Each structure stands twice: as C-alpha cells, then as structure tokens.
C-alpha cells in the first residue's frame, strides 16, 4: 500500500498497489507501465500522477490499470510525444516543450505551466482535430498546417501556421 504522498521509484512487481485516502502517488511511466494501481477500497481524494520523460515519449496510459479517477500525466522533459494519454488530463512542466501530432492530442486536455509549450504538428492530417483543451500559462500553443485541406475542427487558442503553397 502507498500510504503517504510521494514519488515512487522502485519496482512494483506483479502485485496490485493500493493508494490510501488523500494520498498522491507519483511515478514514472516506465514504473507504472503494465501495472495495476487502485484506491484502497474507497475513492477519497487519492491521486496517481504519471511522469512522462522523453525516454517514454511513446507512453500509452491505457497500459496502466487503475480505478483512481484522479489519474493525470505530467510531461517532465522536452519531447516529441507519440503515445496515448487515454483521455487523461496532462500537464507540461515549466520551460518544457511537448511536440505531438494533432491525431495524438485531439480532444485531450493538456496545460503547460509557466513558459511550457505545446507544439502540434500534422494538423492537415487530422482535419477535425479538437485542440480546445490545449493551453499554456505564458508559453505558446502552436499548430502547423502543412497540406491543403478543409479544417473543420477547433483550434482553441493555438497560433496556427499554414505552410507556403498550402490552402487551409
């Protein structure tokens, strides 16, 4: 059982891990991948924070089994994310840039702290992308449209660039 708020860096083995009431467990994706982390029998303010470092840029949060409703991700290093947030809310640390295709972040909620940045690529390949859940405190949210197409999605607050000789 995880009984006190903190960061776990060890090996969870094959056992199901439980998180006590009002406790936040933070661990790297490579520690939690393929594991089961649940609340202790009652859902009472537990939280599970999955840290995604650049080495885990292909992280697929659907590989973590959990009945904790407050399961979030935190991008801790600059990276090109090619994974799956599995509809979980994510944050980007201050001064970090996360780059991802529109297909990988459409419909997701990702908030960058301080000067954190979110750079969306291949917007032309996901013409109905919903970027309305992407935000940055004082950094930037950008989107690149590099092929001709009719965009029908939601750009949110993203500053969008359209490549030369391309129509959006």
Residue positions per predicted region:
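Solvent-exposed, low-complexity segments and loops of surface/extracellular structural proteins
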Residues: 1-168
């Amino acid at each position: 059982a995880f009984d006190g708020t903190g960061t776990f860096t060890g090996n969870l083995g094959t056992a199901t891990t439980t998180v006590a009431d009002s406790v936040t467990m933070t661990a790297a994706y490579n520690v939690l991948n393929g594991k089961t982390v649940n609340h202790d029998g009652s859902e009472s303010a537990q939280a599970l924070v999955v840290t995604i470092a650049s080495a885990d840029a292909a992280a697929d949060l659907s590989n973590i089994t959990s009945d904790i409703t407050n399961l979030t991700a935190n991008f801790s290093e600059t990276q090109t994310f090619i994974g799956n947030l599995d509809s979980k809310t994510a944050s980007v640390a201050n001064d970090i840039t996360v780059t991802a295709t529109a297909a990988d972040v459409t419909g997701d909620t990702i908030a960058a702290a301080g000067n954190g940045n979110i750079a969306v690529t291949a917007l032309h390949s996901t013409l109905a992308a919903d970027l309305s859940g992407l935000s940055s405190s004082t950094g930037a949210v950008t989107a690149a449209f590099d092929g001709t197409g009719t965009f029908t999605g939601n750009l949110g607050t993203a500053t969008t660039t359209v490549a030369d000789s391309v129509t959006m």
